[in-house]
A protein has these predicted regions:
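A structural signal for short, well-ordered beta-strand segments and their strand-loop junctions
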Residues: 8-9, 41-43, 113-115, 146
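Generic structural signal for residues in well-ordered beta-strands
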Residues: 40, 71-72, 144
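A short helix-to-beta-strand connector/capping loop
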Residues: 36, 66-69, 137-142
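C-terminal end-helix/capping segment
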Residues: 126-143
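Short, C-terminally biased terminal segments at protein or domain edges
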Residues: 138-157
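Short, well-structured N-terminal submotif of metal-dependent ribonuclease cores
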Residues: 1-42, 49-63, 87-93, 127-130, ...
């Protein structure tokens, strides 16, 4: 039996559920979570960002069974790693929360971080930058994908 994937999601994935451009791939992703195929890793950074979201967006996470959720906090080590990404100019200072998402996902050893943020996260140059810092500091590489890449197509073995 295959182990369930532990997938860290950022705020763009929650919002993508309700966005015409991204819902086609985001809704099936959340269906897989609800069906017990995926453990979704949620951070306190995501929770803080969702405080500014409309009520219906916040309520999406309440539709996920508790046993499919792993909650994780921003640790001092993750905060420091996020700062290292910024010091290395992988992204600018205004992208600190994005860096914190990546650092948390790296340190909790999530199987993959899923995002719709193409500017700061799901971007080949940025991914190489984050993983370059991870490698230099002795951390695991982080796999970064969109929900579309996590979707099952037809009957897979």
């Amino acid at each position: 039996m295959k182990m369930k994937q532990r997938i860290y999601i950022d705020t763009s994935v929650v919002g993508g559920y309700f966005d015409d451009e991204f819902s086609t791939d985001t809704i099936p992703f959340f269906d897989r979570v609800r069906n017990g195929e995926i453990i979704v890793v949620l951070s306190d950074i995501l929770e803080a960002e969702l405080l500014r979201a409309p009520e219906f967006v916040k309520e999406l996470l309440t539709t996920i069974p508790k046993e499919q959720i792993e909650n994780i906090q921003l640790s001092p080590e993750a905060s420091e790693l996020a700062d290292k990404y910024i010091e290395a100019k992988v992204v600018g200072k205004t992208s600190r929360a994005d860096c914190q998402h990546i650092a948390i996902a790296t340190l909790c050893k999530a199987d993959v971080l899923v995002s719709w943020n193409f500017k700061h996260i799901v971007n080949l140059d940025r991914i190489r930058g984050y993983n370059g810092i991870n490698y230099q500091l002795g951390y695991n590489m982080i796999e970064i994908r969109t929900p579309k890449e996590i979707t099952r197509y037809g009957d897979e073995d």
